[in-house]
A protein has these predicted regions:
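Acidic, serine/threonine-rich low-complexity regulatory regions at protein termini
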Residues: 1-183
Length: 183
């Protein structure tokens, strides 16, 4: 997925890092983060925006994803507050409309998080599973910052993060027959 904007990879990375911080502050579900980043990247691949519009895109993508994933999404006024009231409610709602129409309401795709959850169920990792999967999830979050990884499938990101986490923590035989079948 390539972006059709003046937005540089570093600007995108700063935005995603800020979204991760806000995501943690509101204690949102992990999948909400992945949906937010998917919305941002999908929108940027289809529409040109100015660098100055990147922040409102991020806030609005987070708003949309929380409506989609969360039982109790944060209120728009709370998202505006963490954005230091840089834009109005009307501006965010207009951006929401623009995103939804541009993406034709296609807001999700299988995420690396979901694949990691699947791999967790079929994995042969014995002992310290929580530590391995927590580390793999952390690696996946880091991967969200790097636009050069957009060319890889979510399943590949999940598999790579799991292998790297397991190898880093000295776990062997991560890939059993069930994992081969799952991937």
């Amino acid at each position: 997925m390539q972006t059709a904007t003046e937005v540089k990879d570093t600007s995108r990375a700063f935005l995603i890092e800020w979204i991760i911080d806000v995501h943690r502050k509101f204690r949102l579900l992990p999948e909400t983060l992945y949906v937010t980043v998917y919305i941002i990247d999908s929108f940027l691949s289809l529409k040109q925006i100015k660098k100055s519009q990147l922040h409102i895109l991020g806030v609005t993508a987070l708003l949309i994803s929380t409506k989609y994933e969360e039982i109790y999404p944060p209120e728009l006024k709370d998202l505006l507050t963490v954005s230091e009231n840089k834009f109005t409610k009307a501006e965010v709602l207009q951006m929401e409309k623009d995103i939804l129409l541009t993406l034709q309401f296609d807001l999700t795709a299988p995420s690396a998080y979901r694949f990691l959850e699947r791999f967790r169920r079929v994995s042969s990792i014995v002992g310290h599973e929580e530590k391995v999967f927590f580390f793999a999830q952390y690696l996946q979050e880091i991967s969200l910052l790097d636009a050069s990884l957009l060319k890889y499938k979510a399943s590949e990101i999940a598999a790579a993060s799991l292998i790297l986490a397991a190898k880093s923590l000295k776990k062997v035989n991560v890939w059993n027959k069930d994992m081969e079948k799952a991937t």
